[in-house]
């Protein structure tokens, strides 16, 4: 006959297996590219901080759906433009930085809506500070001041996408 501790442990294990789970397993840089198409001339005409355009896309895919393993890709593209000192109405590209920063997550026992929110809100929120640091370091290494991206409200972006 099993003792009381074995019965309690089995019930606890079954209960834990049915609880919602969203756990990061790892994160990595899938790709990075930084282009400075107008260097070195751009450094001599740069008097003010550049105008920066940031594009952010999120992609996710099941790696092992049966075991709840998913990859989330934070795809960032930044383009910095500076005003040409000879033609103030014209701008020149200072740099373009493209980064795909990824995380692998184990996600179990969630509804489809909770899974979507985890993949499109919670996971990118966790990944963004690391991607931000990589972009700041890359732009510094390219000879520019560090580009510190403003935080992104992924919950708001998700809510807006649901209204469309």
From Swiss-Prot:
One of its GO terms (cellular component) is cytoplasm. GO terms for molecular function: unfolded protein binding. It is found in: Cytoplasm. Keywords: Chaperone, Cytoplasm, Protein transport, Translocation, Transport. Gene3D superfamilies: SecB-like (3.10.420.10). One of its GO terms (biological process) is protein folding. Residues 1-22 are annotated as: Disordered. It comes from the Bacteria. Its main location: cytoplasm. SUPFAM superfamilies: SecB-like. Pfam families: SecB. InterPro entries: SecB, SecB-like_sf. Residues 1-12 have a biased composition (Basic and acidic residues). Homotetramer, a dimer of dimers. One homotetramer interacts with 1 SecA dimer. Belongs to the SecB family. One of the proteins required for the normal export of preproteins out of the cell cytoplasm. It is a molecular chaperone that binds to a subset of precursor proteins, maintaining them in a translocation-competent state. It also specifically binds to its receptor SecA. This is Protein-export protein SecB. It comes from Neorickettsia sennetsu (strain ATCC VR-367 / Miyayama).
